[in-house]
Structure formats: structure tokens, C-alpha cells
A protein has these predicted regions:
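Active-site/ligand-binding loops adjacent to catalytic centers
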Residues: 1-65, 108-113
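Catalytic phosphate/nucleotide-handling subdomain of diverse soluble enzymes
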Residues: 77-113
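General beta-strand structural signal in soluble alpha/beta enzymes
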Residues: 45-46, 67-71, 93
Length: 113
């Protein structure tokens, strides 16, 4: 067994989740993430599907890469968080995958041909 955090409604039932990225449409996280949060070494924030799509467009335009939608959640969170940090603050994130698996979603949501 394991102990972890999960999204719950006011009655303690597992909440429904939605995400533009199927890989992140899950109401819980790993026990490691819960442990790091308990230690004060991790904080979490949410981003909207629109913010994720905007981060996809920005990263694609600036780098020529087309990341999958999962890391675009991280990029969107960084875009929200960075203005509140000092200029010498270091932000690290990971970019994995590519958008090939997400092309149907991207084409529909970004109105691509």
C-alpha cells in the first residue's frame, strides 16, 4: 500500500478531474510528491487548458520544439510564477515527449490545418 494526497469534494469523495492532457487527468499524485509537500519542498498550482495551449505556442515559437502537453503545464505554471521571483532565482523544469501524440487536440483547439 501507499499513502498519498488526492483531490476530494466536500464529502471526501474523489473529485472528477479534467485536463487537456490525458496523462495528467488523474485525481492523485505519487507518494513521493506527497512526501515532498509534507517536507515543505514542493508546492503545487493549477493552470487552465488555455494557459497550457498558450505555453505550447510560446515554446514552439521561441525554440522550434513542439513539446507534448504534459510539460506545457509546467511552462504555464512558470509563466505565472516567474514575475513574482527575483531575477537571480533559478527555475528548473523538464521537457519530455513531443506533440505528435497531441496533434488531434492541438489541431482542434488551436484551429490548425
Amino acid at each position: 500500500g501507499s499513502k498519498s494526497l488526492l483531490l476530494q469534494d466536500k464529502n471526501g469523495m474523489v473529485s472528477n478531474t479534467t485536463s487537456i492532457s490525458a496523462g495528467l487527468d488523474y485525481p492523485s499524485n505519487s507518494p513521493l510528491h506527497s512526501h515532498l509537500k509534507d517536507l515543505g519542498r514542493l508546492s503545487v498550482m493549477s493552470v487552465s487548458d488555455e494557459e497550457v495551449l498558450e505555453s505550447f505556442k510560446t515554446v514552439s515559437q521561441l525554440t522550434g520544439l513542439q513539446p507534448s502537453l504534459e510539460p506545457c503545464h509546467s511552462f504555464a505554471a512558470i509563466a505565472k510564477l516567474a514575475p513574482s521571483l527575483s531575477k537571480d532565482h533559478i527555475i528548473a523544469t523538464n521537457c519530455c515527449g513531443n506533440a505528435l501524440k497531441d496533434m488531434d487536440i492541438l489541431s482542434e483547439r488551436l484551429k490548425l490545418d
